[in-house]
Amino acid sequence: DETIKKYVAIVGLLTHECGHVLYTDFYHSNEVYDSWLGYNFSWGRFVDVSLQEKAEEAKKALNTYPNIRSVFIYDMKSMVNVMEDIFIENMLNLYYSGIYTAGLSLLNNALYECSKTTQEELYEKVVEGNLSITAAVIINLQIKFKLGKEVRNSQNLSKEEEQVKVLVEDFIDENRNIIEKLCWESDGSKRWMLN
């Protein structure tokens, strides 16, 4: 019985990866990633003038200090991958059945039955429409700082990065009620548009 479950889970993993090939727009996604790494980083559309001004201030800081920007973008890519996973699995469950969807279900149960991380809770809120993906990344970044984790490449925060940390925390604290109302566009055809 356990052997059969393992084989079915492997089918689920292969189905998931095939879903990326079937439903992912790689050309478009690469353009988005490139824009994040450049000076055209998209914060999405904000619903309040003061929040927009704060976002511009944070955007400027992220462009000024490349180290912190790379950490932010690394998290953003990670979260978008999760959003994409959700999208492709919804499509697979919609159009395929039998062992394929059974494999997906078994695989997901095996992956997530042990624990739920803070990131996973953030992802759930994004999927439910209660949190924008940009806000989720900012909050995730804030959590990293509060836990005292080091920046990539095992470097401690510089004075400039400490300033960005404070800026991110202020951004969240001052606009939490608005951030929580922002909604990521979950429609498949617009899944890469963060506004």
Predicted feature descriptions by range:
Residues D1-N195:
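Short, functionally important secondary-structure microenvironments
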